[in-house]
Swiss-Prot record:
PROSITE patterns linked: ACONITASE_1, ACONITASE_2
MF terms (GO), sorted A to Z: 3-isopropylmalate dehydratase activity; 4 iron, 4 sulfur cluster binding; metal ion binding
Family: Belongs to the aconitase/IPM isomerase family. LeuC type 1 subfamily.
A Pfam family: Aconitase
EC number of the protein: 4.2.1.33
Alphabetically ordered keywords of this record: 4Fe-4S, Amino-acid biosynthesis, Branched-chain amino acid biosynthesis, Iron, Iron-sulfur, Leucine biosynthesis, Lyase, Metal-binding
Cofactor note: Binds 1 [4Fe-4S] cluster per subunit.
Pathway: Amino-acid biosynthesis; L-leucine biosynthesis; L-leucine from 3-methyl-2-oxobutanoate: step 2/4
Gene source species: Bacillus thuringiensis (strain Al Hakam)
Subunit record text: Heterodimer of LeuC and LeuD.
Cysteine disulfide links: none
GO biological process: L-leucine biosynthetic process
Stored CDD domains: IPMI (cd01583)
Protein name as catalogued: 3-isopropylmalate dehydratase large subunit
Length: 464
């Protein structure tokens, strides 16, 4: 019987197996940020250890930094974490993309764009959404602080091999429907625990037609379905994306040949298989307090099925049977490691070009990295956003999470391109609705959600 992509990635990195069936995996790339690393570095000091492979480690500042005045860090804990990362990287000789550096950005945006992320690698980071890098045919997953220390010290990690889930996507997406809608559909249909104990492999004709940045969105949110990771077999689009990037291999042809071996054999069997036809998918909007609480834009909110639904409706200030079009939007956030890349900003800009943000709506665009920001500005996207009434910010995690100055006030609703809508995720009492960049941009113009499949809404929006 053939092997799955997961099998090939896993087997090539097993150093040894212990009596409990745990495998010691070699880690090819360790990404680090300011929030989950301080205790790990301190652990090295206390045990008089060094970073085993600083050349396979890369750090950036993203979670805590302000995106408006990046050097004006008023929060004491945030400043301490940023200063500590700077000191730790200097002491342990770990490369750091500091504030203002041309390589700085959200950790899961800069990894791919710098060419650090490559097919066949094992990649870890002290962050849940490390699965993003799986879009390149890498086995990438988030780890805890104690594991961060273990990888820093040994460049290895004890792991139990997960099962393999195949998610086959077929059909062509309608205009106005995106990868974000696919993953929100998957979660709404199968729930936040469907992937527990599995690595999700996305494949099929829909995947083949997707560009790399859409694939990253899919893999980014595999963790929201409980999966260990999300992966996609590398192809010509993958190779073309990596080629020529700063940290990509110089002997590219040799590596491309090796990378081409990472795919699921035709006679391999998944432990679980899910088939989704995307042809009739609509834009999705989450209404509740986890990413599976979502509906199509043309559906009404569901009835209360259990105590969790009741709590979610109460927290969100919504009612069963309410129209998605009637959900008020006071804030719009276009950013995060899910949807802050150049193509995401281009889609959002195409929606708002020549239009105005509705009075009373606060709208932010936060590029995922310095390089994304510069590329967007070269295309004039910043002018489109600013003329429409958006705030054009510096890169960072921003409003994705309530760990920096960009937060949603209590009781107010935010159309967000991020990945989590938990209670308090964007600030105390914040009400988060997960959507695609197009849906978020359109909501900024109307102050409520509209259907981005339509060419225009009351004649007010047209795509260029």
């Amino acid at each position: 019987m053939g092997k799955r992509l997961l099998d090939k990635l896993w087997e090539r990195h097993v150093v040894t197996t212990n009596e409990n069936g745990l495998d010691l995996l070699y880690i090819d790339l360790h990404l680090v940020h300011e929030v989950t690393s301080p205790q790990a570095f301190e652990g090295l000091r206390l045990t008089n250890r060094t970073v085993r492979r600083p050349d396979l480690t890369f750090a950036t500042m993203d979670h805590n930094i302000p995106t408006k005045d990046v050097w004006n860090i008023t929060d004491r804990i945030a400043k301490q974490q940023l200063d500590t990362l700077r000191e730790n990287c200097k002491q342990f000789q770990v490369p750091l993309a500091d504030i203002g550096d041309e390589e700085q950005g959200i950790v899961h945006v800069i990894g791919p764009e710098l060419g650090l992320t490559q097919p066949g690698k094992t990649i870890v980071c002290g962050d849940s959404h490390t699965a993003t890098h799986g879009a390149f045919g890498a086995l990438a997953f988030g780890i805890g602080t104690s594991e961060v220390e273990h990888v820093l010290a040994t460049q290895t990690l004890w792991q139990r091999k997960p099962k393999a889930m195949g998610i086959e996507l077929k059909g062509k997406l309608q205009k106005g429907v995106y990868a974000k809608d696919i993953i929100l559909h998957l979660l709404s249909k199968y729930g936040v625990a469907v992937g527990t104990g599995y690595v999700m492999e996305f494949y099929g004709e829909t995947i083949e037609s997707m560009e790399m940045e859409e694939r990253m969105t899919l893999c980014n949110m595999a963790i929201e379905g409980g999966a260990k990771a999300g992966i996609i077999a590398p192809d010509e689009k993958t190779f073309a994306y990596v080629k020529g990037r700063k940290y990509a291999p110089k002997d590219y042809e040799t590596f491309e040949k090796k990378w081409s071996e990472f795919y699921t054999d035709v006679d391999a069997m998944y432990d679980l298989h899910i088939l989704i036809d995307v042809t009739d998918l609509a834009p999705y909007v989450t209404w509740g307090t986890n990413p599976s609480m979502g509906v199509r834009i043309d559906e009404r909110l569901p009835e209360k099925n259990d105590v969790n639904d009741e709590r979610a409706f109460s927290y969100m200030g919504l009612s069963p049977g309410q129209s998605t079009y009637d959900i008020p939007v006071q804030h719009v956030f276009i950013g995060s490691c899910t949807n802050s890349r150049l193509s995401d900003l281009e889609i959002a800009a195409s929606v708002v070009k020549g239009k105005k943000v509705k009075e009373g709506v606060r709208a932010l665009v936060v590029p995922g990295s310095k390089r994304v920001r510069e590329a967007a500005m070269q295309k004039g996207l910043h002018r489109i956003f600013e003329e429409a009434g958006f705030e054009w910010r510096e890169p960072g995690c921003s409003m994705c999470l309530g760990m920096n100055p960009d937060q949603v006030p209590e009781g107010e609703h935010c159309a967000s391109t991020s990945n989590r809508n938990f209670e308090g995720r964007q600030g105390k009492g914040a009400r988060t609705h997960l959507v695609s960049p197009a849906m978020a941009a359109a909501a900024a113009l109307y102050g409520h959600f509209v259907d981005t499949r339509k060419e225009s809404y009351d004649g007010a929006i047209s795509y260029s």
